[in-house]
Swiss-Prot record:
This is UPF0346 protein LSEI_1394. Signal peptide: none annotated. Gene3D superfamilies: YozE SAM-like. Pfam families: YozE_SAM_like (PF06855). InterPro entries: UPF0346, YozE_SAM-like, YozE_SAM-like_sf. Belongs to the UPF0346 family.
C-alpha cells in the first residue's frame, strides 16, 4: 500500500454527496487529530473508537477500509 488511509479517504470527499462515507471523509478532514500517516487497520480503528464520534457506526469505517485495501491492491481509486 502506497498511500495512507487518510489520503484515500480524502478522494471520497464531495460536498454534494451526503452518503455516510462522504460524510466520514468530510469529518475526518475536519478532525485535526486524525492519524493522517496511518495505514494500519487496528490503529485507525482504535483511534476512531475513541475519537470518531462523527461516525454513525464503525461499519462505515470497515466498509471504507475494505475499499481502501482494494484500491491499493489494484493501484486505483475503487469505491462501489
Amino acid at each position: 500500500m502506497h498511500r495512507t488511509f487518510y489520503e484515500y479517504l480524502m478522494t471520497l470527499r464531495n460536498p454534494n454527496d451526503h452518503s455516510e462515507i462522504a460524510e466520514f471523509a468530510k469529518n475526518a478532514f475536519l478532525d485535526q487529530s486524525f492519524p493522517k500517516q496511518e495505514k494500519d487497520y487496528h490503529r485507525l480503528s482504535d483511534y476512531l473508537e475513541l475519537n470518531g464520534n462523527y461516525l454513525p457506526s464503525m461499519a462505515v469505517f470497515d466498509e471504507t477500509y475494505r475499499a481502501y485495501e482494494a484500491s491499493e491492491s489494484t493501484g486505483g481509486d475503487s469505491y462501489q
